[in-house]
C-alpha cells in the first residue's frame, strides 16, 4: 500500500520519529543535522505536492524505494514489503516514453545506494551489469531481467498490456505496476548472507538475529532511508548508534552516509551496535533470552527506555529483570514499554528470528 504523506503532516512526523534509536544522550551536532534534514524533507515534500497534488505525495522510506526524475514528473516506487514496483508519470507530453525510460532504468539499476539521491529529481540511476532486482522480477515470458534488450521488450509489453491511468483532479497520472516474484524477500536476503556471517563471527551475534533485524528494519532494502535519517539495511543513525560504534572502535567522528549505504559497512556497524547493547549497556541482565528481548527492544528505542520500564534506577532495573522469567520480560516489554513502535518491534523481530532459526 502506498504511503501518502501530506506536507502538513511532515513536520510533526519528523519530530515524533526523531528519537527512534537515539539512545539516551543528545548532542548539539545531532540536533543541528536533524533540523537541517527536517527542513530538506519539508522542501522535498513541498515540491512533490506542488506537482502531484496533496494526496499523491510519496517519499522513500525504510521499505520503500522512491525515485523522482523528469523535474519530479516521473517516479519509480518499489514497495519491498508488498513486492510491487509502480512506475508513474504525470508528463503532459509523451507519457509512454517517460514511463518506458523509467521502467528500464528501474529494472536494471545497480545496488549502490550512495550514488543515488532519493531527495532530488536528478536522474542519477545508472544501468548495471548486475541489476539489484535481478531474480526478484521476471518478464512476461517468465525470465529474469539482466540485459537492456530484455528490459526494453518487457517495458513495451507493460505499456501495451498494463498501462493504467487516473486523475488527481488536475492532471492525468499514467502508471504500470509490476509484481515481484513470491520469494523476493528471500532473494534479497541471500545477497547479504556472506556479510551477515562475517559480522556474526566478528561480534558474536547470532546470524538469525541480524537477519531478523534487517528484515524488520528495511526488508533488505539497501536504499533504505527514514524520517529520522536512519540509513541502510540495518537503519543505522550516524550521530547515535554510528557514533557509539566508531567510538568503541577507537575512531573519531561519525560514519558518513556513503559508509552506511555500503551494505557490508552497514551490516558491520549495525551488528557492532547489537553487540554493544548486549555486552555493555544491558550486560547486567543474566538470562540470555531475557537479555535478547531487551537488546531487540533497545535497538529500536534505546537501552535506557528499556530499563526504565522496570525501574528508573538502571542497576535496580537489571535486578528486577533477573527475578523474572524470560516470558514475563517479553510480556512486560510488549505491553508496558512507553513506545508502541518498540512494543511492536520486539514482536516482529522475535517472530522473524524464529523463522530464520528454522531454516
UniProtKB/Swiss-Prot annotation:
Lipoprotein as a keyword of this entry, yes or no, is yes
Q: Which UniProt keywords apply?
A: Cell outer membrane, Cell wall biogenesis/degradation, Lipoprotein, Lyase, Membrane, Palmitate, Signal
Instruction: State the Pfam families in the record.
Output: Mltc_N (PF11873), SLT (PF01464)
* PROSITE patterns, sorted: PROKAR_LIPOPROTEIN, TRANSGLYCOSYLASE
Q: Which GO terms describe its molecular function?
A: hydrolase activity, acting on glycosyl bonds; peptidoglycan lytic transglycosylase activity
Q: InterPro entries, per this entry?
A: Lysozyme-like_dom_sf, Murein_transglycosylaseC, Murein_transglycosylaseC_N, Transglyc_AS, Transglycosylase_SLT_dom_1
Membrane association type: Lipid-anchor
List all disulphide bridges recorded for this chain. none
Q: What's an example GO BP annotation here?
A: peptidoglycan metabolic process
Where does this polypeptide localize?
Answer: Cell outer membrane
Q: Does the keyword Lyase apply?
A: yes
What EC number(s) has UniProt assigned to this enzyme?
4.2.2.n1
What is the top EC class of this enzyme, as a single word? lyase
Task performed by this protein: Murein-degrading enzyme. May play a role in recycling of muropeptides during cell elongation and/or cell division.
Q: NCBIfam families under this entry? A: PRK11671.1
Can you say what this protein is called?
Membrane-bound lytic murein transglycosylase C
Origin species, per record, is Shigella sonnei (strain Ss046)
Amino acid at each position: 500500500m502506498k504511503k501518502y504523506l501530506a506536507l502538513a503532516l511532515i513536520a510533526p512526523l519528523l519530530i515524533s520519529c526523531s528519537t527512534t534509536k537515539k539512545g539516551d544522550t543528545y548532542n548539539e551536532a545531532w540536533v543541528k543535522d536533524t533540523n537541517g534534514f527536517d527542513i530538506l524533507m519539508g522542501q522535498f515534500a513541498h515540491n512533490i505536492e506542488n506537482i502531484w497534488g496533496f494526496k499523491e505525495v510519496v517519499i522513500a522510506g525504510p521499505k520503500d524505494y522512491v525515485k523522482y526524475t523528469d523535474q519530479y514528473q516521473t517516479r519509480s516506487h518499489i514497495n519491498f514489503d508488498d513486492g510491487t514496483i509502480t512506475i508513474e508519470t504525470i508528463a503532459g507530453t509523451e507519457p509512454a516514453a517517460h514511463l518506458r525510460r523509467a521502467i528500464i532504468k528501474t529494472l536494471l539499476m545497480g545496488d549502490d545506494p550512495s550514488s543515488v539521491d532519493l531527495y532530488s529529481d536528478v536522474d542519477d540511476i545508472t544501468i548495471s551489469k548486475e541489476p539489484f532486482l535481478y531474480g526478484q522480477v521476471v518478464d512476461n515470458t517468465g525470465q529474469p531481467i539482466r540485459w537492456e534488450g530484455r528490459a526494453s521488450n518487457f517495458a513495451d509489453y507493460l505499456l501495451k498490456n498494463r498501462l493504467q491511468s487516473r486523475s488527481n483532479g488536475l492532471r492525468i497520472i499514467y502508471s504500470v505496476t509490476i509484481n515481484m516474484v513470491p520469494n523476493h524477500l528471500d532473494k534479497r536476503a541471500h545477497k547479504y548472507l556472506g556479510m551477515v556471517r562475517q559480522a556474526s563471527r566478528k561480534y558474536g551475534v547470532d546470524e538469525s538475529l541480524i537477519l531478523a533485524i534487517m528484515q524488520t528494519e528495511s526488508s533488505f532494502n539497501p536504499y533504505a532511508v527514514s524520517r529520522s535519517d536512519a540509513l541502510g539495511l540495518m537503519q543505522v543513525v550516524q550521530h547515535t548508534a554510528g557514533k557509539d560504534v566508531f567510538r568503541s572502535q577507537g575512531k573519531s567522528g561519525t560514519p558518513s552516509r556513503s559508509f552506511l549505504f555500503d551494505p557490508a559497512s552497514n551490516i558491520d556497524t549495525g551488528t557492532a551496535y547489537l553487540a554493544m547493547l548486549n555486552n555493555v549497556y544491558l550486560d547486567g541482565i543474566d538470562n540470555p533470552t531475557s537479555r535478547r528481548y531487551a537488546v531487540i527492544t533497545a535497538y529500536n528505542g534505546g537501552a535506557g527506555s528499556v530499563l526504565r520500564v522496570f525501574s528508573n534506577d538502571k542497576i535496580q532495573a537489571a535486578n528486577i529483570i533477573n527475578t523474572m522469567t524470560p516470558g514475563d520480560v517479553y510480556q512486560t516489554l510488549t505491553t508496558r514499554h512507553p513506545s508502541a513502535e518498540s512494543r511492536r518491534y520486539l514482536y516482529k523481530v522475535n517472530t522473524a528470528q524464529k523463522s530464520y532459526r528454522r531454516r
